[in-house]
């Protein structure tokens, strides 16, 4: 194992090829058809990946049980055990990310770091350096919205997603279910020059019919309209994709033909061809609604001046998650109203 860590980029390429071979199997993309938090799905995927990538090494800022980033049977890295793969960074997020960058710069290791998404503010300077140096470090950032619930506004991210999305050369994935979470990990573990943030839910999310490996393109049609050019398009990410699909079903009964686009990663979507982007979001359809339980900053490029938003416009509050979504209007009913208003 020490030799694997010292040989640098050659072993990274060998492990990447092995990872791609395994990650392309049906087993990697197979999940139980039941509601599950994307942080929990992520933990299962991480442990699958460790079995084929011995050089996978990382940890959390004293939050591994909550962020689901402990690799079972991989041992804990310490002065007594250099062979351990789980690192206990303590509550020092900026140092954690700096160490992760250092491991990626060294070569031979594939590293990840983790904390609650709201604490990514402390990570930001090192995340920026990850992007600047084109290091494929993976940031596992959980508890991604007001879905955090009772911990209240100090622990509920609002503006953090827009901040990370604004960084050049940084892939920010907010998956809606298990399949999209697998796509996010696939990208994170196989790309060679882009840091990736996995922005994951605390609460259980349903598995969405229509979610697929197309998430690797950053954005795709998860529930299509019957018309080639729909009457309206609802664009969402993460936990709000299910709301968008529910709204589509209601609107179709009223005679409004709706397309739902899942947008787990804006940065990767922007790298697609103009033909692909036009096929997903035809310019001739100007009735668009963005749905996300975070700041709407950055959604304007897809919604435009004629569109509408079902997003957060304030900090959160302390209450059970379902009550918070109702309080702040992140509901199926409000998505339906937003489409009707256009």
Q: Which ranges hold each PLM region?
A:
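Short coil/turn connectors at secondary-structure junctions
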Residues: 52-56, 81-85, 106-110, 133-138, ...
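Thiamine diphosphate
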Residues: 57, 64-161, 181, 183, 190-342
């Amino acid at each position: 194992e020490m030799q694997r860590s010292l040989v640098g980029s050659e072993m990274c390429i060998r492990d990447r090829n092995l990872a791609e071979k395994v990650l392309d199997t049906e087993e990697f993309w197979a999940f139980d058809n039941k509601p599950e938090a994307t942080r929990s799905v992520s933990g299962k995927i991480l442990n699958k990946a460790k079995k084929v990538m011995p050089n996978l090494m990382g940890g959390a800022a004293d939050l591994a049980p909550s962020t689901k980033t402990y690799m079972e049977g991989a041992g804990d890295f310490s002065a007594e055990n250099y062979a351990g793969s789980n690192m206990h960074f303590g509550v020092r997020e900026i140092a954690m990310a700096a160490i992760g960058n250092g491991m990626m710069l060294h070569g031979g290791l594939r590293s990840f770091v983790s904390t609650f998404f709201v604490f990514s503010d402390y990570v930001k300077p090192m995340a920026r350096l990850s992007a600047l140096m084109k290091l494929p470090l993976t940031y596992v950032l959980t508890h991604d919205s007001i879905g955090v619930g009772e911990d209240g506004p100090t622990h509920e991210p609002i503006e953090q997603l827009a901040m990370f999305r604004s960084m050049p050369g940084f892939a920010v994935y907010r998956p809606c279910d298990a399949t999209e979470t697998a796509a996010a990990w696939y990208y994170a573990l196989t790309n060679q020059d882009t840091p990736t943030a996995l922005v994951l839910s605390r609460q259980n999310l349903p598995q969405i019919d229509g979610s697929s490996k197309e998430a690797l393109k950053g954005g795709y049609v998860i529930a299509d309209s019957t018309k080639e050019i729909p009457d309206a398009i609802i664009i969402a990410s993460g936990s709000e994709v299910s709301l968008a699909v529910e709204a589509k079903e209601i609107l179709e009964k009223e005679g409004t033909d709706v397309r739902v686009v899942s947008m787990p990663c804006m940065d990767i979507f922007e790298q697609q061809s103009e033909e692909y982007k036009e096929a997903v979001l035809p310019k001739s359809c100007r009735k668009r609604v963005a749905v996300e339980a975070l700041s709407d900053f950055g959604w304007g490029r897809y919604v435009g001046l004629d569109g509408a938003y079902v997003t957060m416009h304030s900090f959160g509050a302390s209450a059970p998650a379902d009550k918070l979504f109702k309080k702040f209007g992140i509901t199926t009913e409000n998505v339906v109203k937003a489409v009707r208003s256009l």
